[in-house]
């Protein structure tokens, strides 16, 4: 078929870049306050998460289990600009708010990559993966090796030296997706 037949007739051949990014200096005080509150709440959630991860690590250390524990921390996608608050008049912060970052902050959250979850750009898919395993993973190392969430099960099976079963309760299993990240973790 001709190329013009493959175009989305509603969006036209060339789609302008989506953006709601307005330079900070061009925002009015109310807009600045709203964006400031949004990022303050997000930062508070990150801080709360960090404190609680610290509590888990402290408990593992107190019980003498930290040295024998592999901890993986990752997320499945980059920041996401959802405008899906359940109540129009609720600002970010209360427990009944489902306020997410707007596109401008979501894009900043994925720096240095462009865009966010809904887009095909790296900001939506190129995310951090942090692994901590005392005595096994060399501290303060960084790799550019690509991995995916489907690599976690093969990694743990490899670490524990457990073969992936061919059957479960006499039913054949599907092939396991992913690859072990153990060689990457070990340097």
Description of each model-found segment:
Residues 1-175:
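Active-site-proximal cap/lid insertion segments
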């Amino acid at each position: 078929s001709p190329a013009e037949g493959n175009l989305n007739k509603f969006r036209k051949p060339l789609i302008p870049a989506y953006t709601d990014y307005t330079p900070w200096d061009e925002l009015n005080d109310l807009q600045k306050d709203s964006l400031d509150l949004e990022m303050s709440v997000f930062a508070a959630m990150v801080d709360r998460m960090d404190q609680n991860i610290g509590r888990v690590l402290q408990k593992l250390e107190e019980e003498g289990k930290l040295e024998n524990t592999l901890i993986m921390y990752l997320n499945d996608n980059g920041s996401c600009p959802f405008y899906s608050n359940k109540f129009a008049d609720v600002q970010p912060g209360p427990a009944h708010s489902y306020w997410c970052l707007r596109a401008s902050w979501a894009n900043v959250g994925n720096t240095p990559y462009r865009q966010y979850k809904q887009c095909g750009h790296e900001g939506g898919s190129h995310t951090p993966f942090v692994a901590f395993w005392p005595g096994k993973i060399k501290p303060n190392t960084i790799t550019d090796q690509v991995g995916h969430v489907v690599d976690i099960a093969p990694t743990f099976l490899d670490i524990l030296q457990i073969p992936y079963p061919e059957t479960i309760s006499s039913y054949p299993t599907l092939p396991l997706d992913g690859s072990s990240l153990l060689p990457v973790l070990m340097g």
